[in-house]
């Protein structure tokens, strides 16, 4: 069972309330989006156990970025939270042992701007990595090797300051988990391999933290995982067996909330999001203005 919450800092709320009172209002109008577990092959038996207050709306389990949504007029600061439970299942895959079908599907192979962009540099890199290879499994493996063996984990500024996170990663050879995942997705799509985004939390008894990873599709097996930042970590540790494990597989300690990058919320957030690409900790809008950074406090723990 996970417990998660989001709220304004007291200082942020005080400033917002003072501005509202200067306009003749005694409350601030707040909209909140908090991530919830979404339906996917690795996640089932999802139960929303409790909320700090009944949400105005709960997005369906199939939403690309699933959230609980609250809308309220606040005279006092408060937090918006949820407790939920789910079953996490790891489906083992051995892509390097499979025989790929001669004809592969073409869904999830298009550009998805601004970050899944087929720039000249990315197209040239994909061509170089897959030159002489016809097997889609080996193409995906070459791309995974490039990311995990060449890109160094590096904390990133908020993604909204980047024009294109994937081209920048391929050139600088630096990125965090989301940048690595998006770079893998972009190169796979250029090579004709269906690939997509998945993200949420790493949820362990002792800790919980944000994480992003990728999925790729090879017929007849179907969707498999590529956790490039975990693979890069194993490469740094000299653990080749585990680096290869994350080409096709995930651990069971994941809470999946998002199945697409840069997807709108349901209902949509009309102001600028703190993270327009992803949603791992939630978003708050106060009187039509989105909050970010130190204006917001979040929690996530295993209970």
Label each region the model flagged.
Residues 136-143, 173-188:
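Active-site nucleophilic cysteine motif
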Residues 44-45, 92-93, 235-240:
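A short, polar/proline- and glycine-enriched secondary-structure boundary/capping micro-motif
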Residues 248-303:
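Low-complexity, Gly/Ser/Thr/Pro-rich intrinsically disordered linker/tail segments
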Residues 47-52, 96-105, 228-231:
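Short intrinsically disordered coil segments
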Residues 32, 143, 214:
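Terminal peptide-recognition signature
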